[in-house]
Each structure stands twice: as structure tokens, then as C-alpha cells.
């Protein structure tokens, strides 16, 4: 038996302690008298073994995290205890005691660390794209698959439309119509001219959203345009002149409040959103327009490529499924196959 493996009795004690800490009405223990009463809070941001927790009165507190807490991310609802003033005049950090059950969690697979959670308790993923650094339908489709798998509503936002001339606008409208036709909500906005921003604010109201998308598409600029001027501005970098790719500006996921009542989590940008932790069947189901045709192929094990009698390919040829989406579906499956052997190889070496 591994010396790090907990016995059943130890596991029961850990679980019992966790449940006890979820009771906010309990009395502080004598051996931690420098901490106040337990109360509810929400994680605003996580920094290593510390987290910023917002109390019910809106005040944020830097807290340590109990070692028994296996996972803590921005958006988590927690039970925490504030630090009291020590005799030496040094402020004692608070401590996160327990985490409430999540309604949802957005995860990102990592080739070396496995599946990594990004944010919790979100009910809307704002997929931000732009004509610069690149209008990538592949990245949009990856996030849409994640939304469908998590059962979280997506909102596609195309930023920087002020950079488009009439022909460019017509081209972009055609690309976005691919998503409108299959039921997705799409907004075209500009954080510079504020075109479309009022509709964007309405879509954010009453929601806990997360901004997702490749670097350089203007996620931070959009947030700065939406946040009240009293809030600190989020760092904004331009697209790199050398690579043409966006430079990462957000270093840790952080939750912000809007005056209209919505909450937004700004997360580090990603250039590619991996989905290799999902089964191929989940990817297929993640394309909503495919669902009416699944089960109608000639062969039960149809790969939806060049197999005779493929219902999906016939739908593409008939214009019922966008060819761009069908191609991205196969690109996602191919990228999964390329990533999995690397992950397996890394695990074998350990």
C-alpha cells in the first residue's frame, strides 16, 4: 500500500471535518482564537495557497486555505473565518474552511497536470473573438463543445468590429450567421466605439459569466469598458508585432461585479482550448446541429468521414450543416488523438 494513501477511517474523518466546517453557526475553536466566526463568502481570486474572499458586506479578505481543501477556484462559494487583530498589531489572515458544492465548474485539460479547474458556479461562458489577431471559428467551436458538455449557456461576442470596412463586416456577418442559424446568441461589439455594448450589458445582467477566448481578442478591453470607473483597470496589451498573437494580460482568474448586477470572471487567455479529456461521443454531441442526424448513418460504427451512407456528410452536402463546423469537428477529434499519446507517454515515465 502506498504510504500516501488514506485509510477508510482517515477518509471518513477528513469528510466529517469538512462537513463540520460547512456549518457557519459553530463556535470558534480554542486553538485558533485569532480567527473570527465562520461566515459565507465567494472566492474573488486564487493565488497559490492564498485566496481573496469577498464577505457579504462586499469587503475582500486575503485568506489562507485549509490543507484539506483539494480544489479552490474563482467563483467558489465558501465558508471562511476572518483574521482578528493580533496583540502585536499584525493583521492575521483569514482562512477558508470549506467549499460548498459547485453548480458547475469549467475545466481545462493540461498535458502534464491533468484536468485543471478554471472557474466555478458559472452559468454563462462569454466566448470572445475578434478579427485580430485571427477570427478562429475552430476556437469558437471548441468553447461551444465545452459549453454543451457543461450545460452552460454560451454567448458569442465578436469584438473590434470598428476595424472592419463594409466588405469585412459582410464577411464577418456571414461567419457569425453560421452560429445564429443553429440557435446561438451572437453579439458584435466594439469596446472603443461602444457599438453593441448596451446589448452586451443586458446579456450579462443577473449572470455569473466567464470571459474565454484566445489572447489579443480584447477581453480585458471589454471588461474595462464595462466596469465602473472606480474599479482598477485591467492591464491591456496589444497584439504582438512579431508573432501576430495576443500577449497574455491576465495572470490569474478574477471575479468582478457590474453595477447592473452581473458578475464576470476574467480568466487567463488561451491560444488553444484542449478537449482531449472528453470522449469522442461527447465531442459529437457537443455539435448541436449534428444531433438530429446521429443514429441515421448506414453503419453503426460510422466515423463520419468518408463512410458510405454517413448521415452527417449527407447533411453537409445538402447545406443543412455548415462545412466549416463539420471540418472543425474533425480537427478537434484529430487534436485529441495527437494529445492523448503524449499524455500517456508522460504518465508512463512517471
From Swiss-Prot:
Q: Which Gene3D superfamilies match?
A: Nucleic acid-binding proteins (2.40.50.140), P-loop containing nucleotide triphosphate hydrolases (3.40.50.300), Probable gtpase engc, domain 3 (1.10.40.50)
Q: How is the cofactor bound?
A: Binds 1 zinc ion per subunit.
Its Enzyme Commission number? Answer: 3.6.1.-
Q: What keywords sit in the KW lines? A: Cytoplasm, GTP-binding, Hydrolase, Metal-binding, Nucleotide-binding, Ribosome biogenesis, RNA-binding, rRNA-binding, Zinc
Compositionally biased region (Polar residues) = 1-17
Q: Which InterPro entries match?
A: G_CP_dom, NA-bd_OB-fold, P-loop_NTPase, Ribosome_biogen_GTPase_RsgA, RsgA_GTPase_dom
The main location is cytoplasm
EC top class, as a word: hydrolase
According to UniProt, the name of this protein is Small ribosomal subunit biogenesis GTPase RsgA
Origin organism is Yersinia enterocolitica serotype O:8 / biotype 1B (strain NCTC 13174 / 8081)
**Which ranges carry the CP-type G domain?**
103-273
Enumerate the subcellular locations listed in this protein's record, separating them with semicolons.
Cytoplasm
SUPFAM superfamilies reported in the protein's UniProt record: P-loop containing nucleoside triphosphate hydrolases
Its quaternary organisation is:
Monomer. Associates with 30S ribosomal subunit, binds 16S rRNA.
Q: What is the stated purpose of this protein?
A: One of several proteins that assist in the late maturation steps of the functional core of the 30S ribosomal subunit. Helps release RbfA from mature subunits. May play a role in the assembly of ribosomal proteins into the subunit. Circularly permuted GTPase that catalyzes slow GTP hydrolysis, GTPase activity is stimulated by the 30S ribosomal subunit.
Which domain of life does this protein belong to?
Bacteria
Amino acid at each position: 500500500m502506498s504510504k500516501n494513501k488514506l485509510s477508510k477511517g482517515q477518509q471518513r474523518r477528513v469528510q466529517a471535518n469538512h462537513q463540520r466546517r460547512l456549518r457557519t453557526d459553530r463556535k470558534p475553536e480554542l486553538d485558533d482564537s485569532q480567527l473570527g466566526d465562520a461566515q459565507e463568502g465567494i472566492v474573488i481570486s486564487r493565488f497559490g495557497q492564498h485566496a481573496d474572499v469577498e464577505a457579504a458586506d462586499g469587503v475582500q479578505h486575503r485568506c489562507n486555505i485549509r490543507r484539506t481543501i483539494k480544489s479552490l477556484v474563482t467563483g467558489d462559494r465558501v465558508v471562511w473565518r476572518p483574521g482578528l487583530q493580533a496583540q502585536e498589531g499584525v493583521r492575521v489572515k483569514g482562512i477558508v474552511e470549506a467549499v460548498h458544492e459547485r453548480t458547475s465548474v469549467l475545466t481545462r485539460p493540461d498535458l502534464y497536470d491533468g484536468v485543471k479547474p478554471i472557474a466555478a458556479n458559472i452559468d454563462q461562458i462569454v466566448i470572445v473573438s475578434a478579427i485580430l489577431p485571427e477570427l478562429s471559428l475552430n476556437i469558437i467551436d471548441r468553447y461551444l463543445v465545452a459549453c454543451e458538455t457543461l450545460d452552460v449557456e454560451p454567448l458569442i461576442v465578436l469584438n473590434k468590429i470598428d476595424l472592419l470596412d463594409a466588405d469585412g463586416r459582410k464577411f464577418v456577418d456571414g461567419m457569425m450567421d453560421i452560429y445564429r442559424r443553429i440557435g446561438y446568441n451572437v453579439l458584435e461589439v466594439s469596446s472603443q466605439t461602444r457599438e453593441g455594448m448596451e446589448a452586451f450589458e443586458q446579456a450579462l445582467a443577473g449572470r455569473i459569466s466567464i470571459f474565454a477566448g484566445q489572447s489579443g481578442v480584447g477581453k480585458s478591453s471589454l471588461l474595462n469598458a464595462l466596469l465602473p470607473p472606480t474599479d482598477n483597470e485591467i492591464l491591456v496589451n496589444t497584439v504582438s508585432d512579431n508573432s501576430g498573437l495576443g500577449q497574455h494580460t491576465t495572470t490569474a482568474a478574477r471575479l468582478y461585479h457590474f453595477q447592473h448586477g452581473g458578475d464576470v470572471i476574467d480568466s487567463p487567455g488561451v491560444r488553444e482550448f484542449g478537449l482531449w479529456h472528453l470522449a469522442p461521443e461527447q465531442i459529437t454531441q457537443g455539435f448541436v446541429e449534428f444531433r438530429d442526424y446521429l443514429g441515421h448513418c448506414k453503419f453503426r460504427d460510422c466515423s463520419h468521414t468518408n463512410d458510405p451512407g454517413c448521415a452527417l456528410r449527407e447533411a453537409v452536402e445538402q447545406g443543412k450543416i455548415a462545412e466549416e463546423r463539420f471540418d472543425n469537428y474533425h480537427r478537434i477529434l484529430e487534436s485529441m488523438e495527437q494529445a492523448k499519446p503524449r499524455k500517456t507517454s508522460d504518465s508512463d515515465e512517471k
